[in-house]
Amino acid sequence: MRLFARVMLGRHPCYWIVGLSVAFSAPVAMAADSPLLECAAVVNPTERLACYDRLAGADKPAVDNHPAAAGPPPAALPTANPATPAVPLVMSEPTPMSRLWELETGTRNDVFTLQPYQLMYAMPVKYSDAVNQTPFRGQFHGENGASAQLQDVEAKFQISGKMKVADDLLWDNAAFWLAYTQESHWQIYNHAISAPFRETDYEPEAFLVFPTQYQLFGFNARFVSLGVVHQSNGESDPLSRSWNRVYAEFGLERGNFSLMIKPWWRIPESASSDDNPDISNYIGRGELQGIYRFDKSLISVTLRDNLRADNHGSARIDYVFPIYKKLNGYVQFFSGYGESLIDYNFRQDTIGVGISVGDGI
């Protein structure tokens, strides 16, 4: 024990604790022939230190108690992906012009299907600031036989429809249409002359429609139409009025705005059969129509001009607004010549209110 204490308290004081432990456990260690005594008996300090290290396990590899830093997750094994269901291609909504003239594949109807053409409306009340009495002078008589006058308030209505009779013409690029429009002016409140129809104009026509796809002044050019139209009031002289025209119409669109440009040429008639030789100088030689659609409503402005210095023609404004489903409210304002065929050379301003049904223009 004296040797062990001398060694432990010699040049290495750091082993006092170890030495004290050995001293307190000496009886047991000596009885068990403890290896600590063997290390204590080593004279060389370096070798003695190595001996104690071996006993303490210092020469074993250090064990890292800290978890290893997480690395990237292992790459997933490739697996067969389930088949992705096909998503149907969502097409853009057809424009009003496409629907009216079937300019795209998804808008086409069968031939011989009756469809809207011009606006169909009924105005129970239409007021005129000037009434054309001249053509009817002597035509209407009251109950006492005296000549009666037309009233400045009457009703007006129009029916119109079109039908495609052939498709895929001329290199599969044209459709042939027939159309009919009828407009009536009814002196419904004029009981003095038995509430007659003052004027009814009949307008059948036939035309080819060619779809187009090009840009023009920021507009999408959608179609070109070539047609012939007859318009008459079905009366005999002196009230007969009629004319025949050929026309070209160009349809343009830009957003909610549609523009139709329609020049025409009157087919000449013989002087003996022409009831209204100067009709082009009043009703005009062409028409420009702009339509703006918004919130299921539309405003249409139609301008006609004779393309002469005196600038005769007309302007018409139509306002259509929704009431219930296909039933719409309708307001019409007209100013100029030709509000009807019998009035082709008579100027007046009119305004009327009523209802419109279905789609048109």
State what each model feature region is.
Residues 25-26:
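N-terminal signal peptide c-region/cleavage motif recognized by signal peptidases
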Residues 331, 348-361:
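Outer-membrane beta-barrel "beta-signal"
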